[in-house]
Amino acid sequence: MANFKGHALPGSFFLIVGLWWSVKYPLKYFHHKGLKNNRLSRQQERIEIIEGAVKTLFAIIGILAEQFVPDGPHLHLYHENQWVKLMNWQHSTMYLFFGVSGLMDMITYLYFHIVPLGLDRVVLAMAVFIEGFLFYFHVHNRPPLDQHIHSLLLFGLFGAAVSISLEVILRDNIVLELFRTSLLILQGTWFWQIGFVLFPPFGRPEWDQKDMDNIMFITMCFCWHYLVALCIVAINYSLVYCFLTRVKRRAEGEIIGIQKLKSDHTYQSALLSGSDEE
């Protein structure tokens, strides 16, 4: 959808998943830290399956929104010797590949004894690459600011595709996972930024899309967005660490208390048995 909602919708999807990853991966990392066996528990596998289902649901919602809005193509690709709403079709194609990625996530953890390890990462990398590929040819013959604000997103997309591809070999690498998370959060916030710049809501004045100062500001703004994404990842990582440390200390305190009660009970029993003998 070539409007504000058409950019806010995917931006919200990517932002939700990115925020979830910024909590999930630190939890997973600290849980497995120090353990010899990195195999996922049943509960963790269930979470991965649910995440795949949610990704697939987001993709279906996105496709339906692109196709069946009032001015959408309604599944018509070619009509009366001309293409029908190709921009909506490009967005639908992007959602389609992320839906396939969600399905592969579910298949990977439902049939882990059959599916080769790393195939879920391959499909996710492919989905991100396809998104970047579509965006590269999405803005030809557009005003300079429109082209520039979309092209900036390509750096994050292709960077994420390379990072996810490395995860096929270096699976469960916390650095790569957090890097991918930061780029996904960046992608989510930047979709919102594109919507505000190209389709200003609430009756705000439109941006001059040929003004070089606007292009310079948007470039700087992209860097700020990524800094915010990194801060979000760092803050959530720290919060997860503090939370788990507190839970661990409380659990250790309870264990020490139980052991102390047991030792006191044993000592009292010994005293009683000694007095009985006397």
Swiss-Prot record:
InterPro entries: DUF716 (IPR006904), TMEM45 (IPR042127). This is Transmembrane protein 45B. PANTHER family: EPIDIDYMAL MEMBRANE PROTEIN E9-RELATED, TRANSMEMBRANE PROTEIN 45B. The keyword Metal-binding does not apply. One of its GO terms (cellular component) is lysosomal membrane. It is a multi-pass membrane protein. It comes from the Eukaryota. The modification Phosphoserine is found at S273, S275. Plays a role in innate immunity. One of its GO terms (biological process) is innate immune response. The chain crosses the membrane at residues 7-27, 49-69, 95-115, 117-137, 149-169, 183-203, 215-235. It is found in: Endosome membrane; Lysosome membrane; Golgi apparatus, trans-Golgi network membrane. Belongs to the TMEM45 family. Keywords: Endosome, Golgi apparatus, Immunity, Innate immunity, Lysosome, Membrane, Phosphoprotein, Transmembrane, Transmembrane helix. It comes from Mus musculus (Mouse).
